[in-house]
């Protein structure tokens, strides 16, 4: 196996000596999109399986409709596949999107929660899943699956084959999947998936093995956009979507996302001794991900829910009534009129397009190398150490996907406020007034590069009464921007390579467990971690320039939890108290500011948040066929200081406002602070399983805008009612959701062979409760007249009662 070792060492060396240019994509206005298609609707709970923490499974598969994330901290999960963390510090590369619908290719080796010790790696997040694609872990045979759903997909097909040879022969695991949702059959519009995966593994002499995995998923799907409550009322639809419209008599969905990134990984493992193992992993992902949407410049806003077009904008009650009646009788007016848009483009004297369908492209090269060494000293002491090198390079540009009956589109920056300078609008001053044709690139053209080297070591001791572990990690992150266009706004700072930005990070954690008896024990986990910023935080707006974001400090997190556990034969009880603090949080937003009559950058820095609460759960087995799971959780997630902020004009980065934000004691999370969950799983017969889960969620804050809560604005308000209407944060009403699933297996006889068939049915929101999945304040605010209702809240609602049906045939 000398050639395998040589290959790994060569690629490790290559990754290390490469020049390290860091990247990160532009931070644009957040697009609030709830993507129902990402949920696993055909999941059926595993009956009578004791999890370390039932909160994770209940919240993940049943509580997402409330944005229920245990302990309140979003985006705090990670997934390690074959020893590789594919997550990137750069925007534009969504690793999980690259295997959408392909979860069957993975086998879970381990999962740790609350930063507990793992022999598979070092976790810095609330929950880390360690997955493998090794063909050795799948049973030999064929699996054929078909499914139907009115939420995630209309139809799905999967074929899975695993071939297991002799010990020293190659083993194969292969997987094919397709999903299809025709236009208009889901709130997001459409969905198309074609994916394939192949995994090869071979055992060699001297306890060595090598494996190769390739997955390739081509997915495109629509995205649902939020809207104000008024349009939901006018449309009489709980899943109203303003981002689609009619084109030549057909439904047209321009708001979408796609992925086309093949991912290759190679793994090598060797047992050096009976007590030590080394694992080496290499990975490479090369391809393209992106989004598309309707764009426009120098013309009227085409969005049907634009505030000036709605009845509420009129001050005349008679006019409002007439508009309400008109929308009631003309529901097509609540969708985009693409036929009208085409006429406007055609009517242009020069045949210039004012409206286009734009595609935001991220051209991705992502390389990974990692090593893990595990050592068992004796029956009491063990340790593991590892390193991962991550190198990402992403090229960002726009492509005109559809000119909508026009002949060209000017390569202008439509977000610029006219300052009288002739070159301000130019995206590329070397090609001024460039006419872009369909399929050609336009707009920002830049590259971001990043490199991270992460290392860690962990030690664990087990004794009859005590267990403890401790771990230390250190990482270095590097970022750089490279601009390929010289735009008219930032002539001296848009073209060429930026300064190389370097950020170290370090952290430690510890775990102590005391066993009162074989059934009862107490555990405490504590940690302190310094995180490096990602590229979106480092650069203010890399699409235009390489200026660094203000308030750039390392993110600091520390915390502790204390838990009590009882593990009986028929009952399992958990009670946990936790406290976590986060410092130097930052936020950045691009929006239009009425007071300055300009697009601006809003930057928040040195924000501090506290997450604290109690978690409890009970599992018990009744009558030998019924498992009952209950959970009650209460938390308090709040901002603990008044952070700093700045407002910078987009045209020239001139600071027009700065100071403090009055955010102290306001909510730090949008998930519910109070949750109660009950799950009943029954097995009336050996082949039949039934599950019913109900979740009650309360004290759930909306997502709110920080910048209108500045001391600069609020301290001038003498009227308490006006002050409260702007400063205070609204909470959503407490609600309840009921979900259910049913599975049945039967055996067909074919000669002497039995062929098992598995059927499963899952139902979400059985009571069809109208649940707002997402509610947020718009970034646009009336800073002049301080009218909080001028730009009302935007909503996305749950789809209501949804189902998924799956049938699987297995031949061994």
Locations of the language-model features?
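Periplasmic plug
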Residues: 48, 68-114, 130
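A beta-strand signature from Gram-negative outer-membrane beta-barrel systems
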Residues: 96-145, 156-158
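Acidic/polar loop-and-plug regions of large Gram-negative outer-membrane beta-barrel proteins
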Residues: 209-267, 292-358, 423-436, 590
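Surface-exposed extracellular loop regions of Gram-negative outer-membrane beta-barrel proteins
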Residues: 227, 425-435, 478-489, 508, ...
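Outer-membrane beta-barrel signature, preferentially recognizing the C-terminal barrel domain
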Residues: 239-263, 267, 446-448, 496-511, ...
């Amino acid at each position: 196996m000398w050639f395998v070792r040589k290959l790994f060492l060569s690629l490790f060396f290559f990754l290390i000596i490469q020049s390290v240019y860091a990247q990160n994509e532009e931070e644009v206005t957040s697009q609030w999109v709830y993507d129902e298609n990402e949920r696993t609707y055909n999941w059926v709970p595993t009956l009578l399986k004791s999890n370390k923490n039932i909160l994770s499974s209940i919240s993940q598969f049943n509580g997402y409709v409330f944005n229920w994330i245990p302990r309140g901290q979003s985006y705090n999960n990670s997934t390690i596949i074959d020893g590789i963390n594919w997550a990137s510090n750069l925007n534009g590369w969504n690793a999980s999107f690259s295997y959408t619908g392909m979860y069957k290719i993975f086998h879970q080796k381990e999962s740790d929660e609350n930063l507990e010790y793992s022999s598979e790696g070092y976790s810095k997040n609330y929950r880390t899943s360690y997955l493998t694609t090794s063909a050795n872990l799948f049973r030999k045979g064929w699996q054929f699956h078909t499914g139907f759903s009115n939420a995630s997909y209309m139809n799905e097909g999967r074929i899975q084959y695993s071939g297991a040879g002799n010990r020293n022969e190659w083993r194969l695991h292969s997987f094919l999947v397709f999903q299809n949702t025709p236009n208009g059959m889901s709130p997001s519009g459409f969905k198309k998936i074609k994916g394939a995966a192949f995994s090869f593994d071979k055992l060699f002499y001297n306890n060595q093995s090598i494996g190769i995995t390739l997955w390739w998923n081509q997915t495109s799907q629509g995205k649902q956009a939020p809207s104000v409550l008024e349009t939901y009322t006018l449309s009489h639809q709980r899943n109203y979507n303003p981002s689609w419209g009619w084109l030549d008599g057909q439904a047209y969905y321009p708001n979408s996302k796609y992925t086309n990134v093949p991912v290759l990984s190679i793994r090598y493992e060797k047992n050096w001794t009976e007590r030590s193992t080394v694992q080496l992993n290499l990975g490479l992902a090369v391809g393209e991900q992106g989004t598309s949407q309707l764009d426009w410049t120098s013309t009227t806003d085409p969005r049907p829910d634009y505030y000036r077009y709605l009845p509420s904008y009129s001050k005349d009650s008679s006019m409002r009534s007439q508009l309400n009646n008109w929308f009631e009788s003309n529901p097509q007016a609540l969708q985009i009129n693409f036929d009208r848009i085409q006429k406007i483009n055609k009517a242009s004297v020069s045949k210039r397009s004012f409206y286009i369908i734009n595609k935001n492209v991220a051209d991705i090269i992502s390389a990974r190398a990692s090593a893990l060494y595990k050592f068992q000293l004796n029956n009491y002491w063990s340790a593991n150490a590892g390193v991962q090198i991550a190198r990402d390079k992403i090229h960002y540009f726009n492509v005109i996907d559809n000119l909508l009956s026009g002949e060209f589109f000017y390569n202008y920056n439509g977000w610029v406020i006219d300052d009288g300078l002739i070159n301000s609008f130019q995206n590329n001053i070397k090609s001024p007034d460039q006419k872009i044709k369909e399929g050609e690139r336009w707009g920002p053209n830049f590259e971001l590069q990043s490199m991270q080297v992460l290392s860690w070591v962990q030690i664990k001791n087990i004794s009859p009464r005590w267990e403890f572990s401790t771990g230390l990690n250190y990482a270095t992150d590097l970022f750089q921007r490279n601009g390929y266009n010289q735009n008219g706004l930032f002539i001296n700072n848009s073209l060429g390579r930026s300064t190389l930005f370097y950020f170290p990070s370090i952290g430690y954690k510890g775990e102590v467990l005391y066993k009162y008896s074989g059934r009862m024990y107490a555990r405490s986990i504590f940690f302190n971690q310094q995180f490096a910023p990602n590229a979106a935080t480092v650069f203010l707006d890399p699409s235009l320039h390489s200026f660094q974001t203000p308030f750039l400090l390392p993110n600091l997190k520390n915390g502790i939890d204390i838990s009590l556990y009882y593990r009986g034969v028929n009952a399992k009880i958990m009670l946990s108290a936790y406290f976590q603090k986060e410092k130097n949080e930052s936020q950045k937003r691009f929006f239009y500011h009425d007071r300055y009559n300009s697009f601006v950058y809003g930057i928040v820095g040195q924000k501090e948040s506290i997450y604290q609460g109690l978690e409890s759960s009970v599992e018990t087995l009744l009558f030998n066929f019924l498992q009952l799971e209950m959970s009650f959780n209460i938390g308090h997630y709040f901002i603990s200081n008044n952070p700093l902020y700045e407002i910078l004009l987009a045209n020239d980065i001139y600071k027009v406002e700065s100071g403090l934000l009055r955010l102290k004691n306001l909510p730090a999370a949008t998930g519910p602070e109070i949750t109660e969950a009950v799950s009943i799983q029954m097995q009336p017969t050996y082949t039949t399983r039934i599950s019913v889960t109900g979740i009650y969620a309360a004290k759930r804050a909306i997502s709110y805008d920080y910048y209108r809560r500045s001391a600069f604005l609020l301290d001038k308000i003498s009227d308490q009612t006006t002050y409260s209407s702007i400063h205070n944060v609204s909470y959503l009403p407490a609600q309840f959701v009921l979900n259910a699933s049913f599975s049945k297996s039967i055996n067909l006889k074919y000669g002497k062979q039995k062929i098992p068939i598995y059927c499963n049915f899952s139902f979400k929101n059985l009571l069809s409760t109208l649940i707002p999945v997402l509610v947020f304040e718009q970034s646009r605010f009336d800073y002049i007249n301080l009218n909080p209702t001028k730009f009302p809240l935007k909503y996305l609602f749950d789809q209501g009662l949804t189902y998924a049906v799956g049938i699987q045939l297995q031949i061994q």
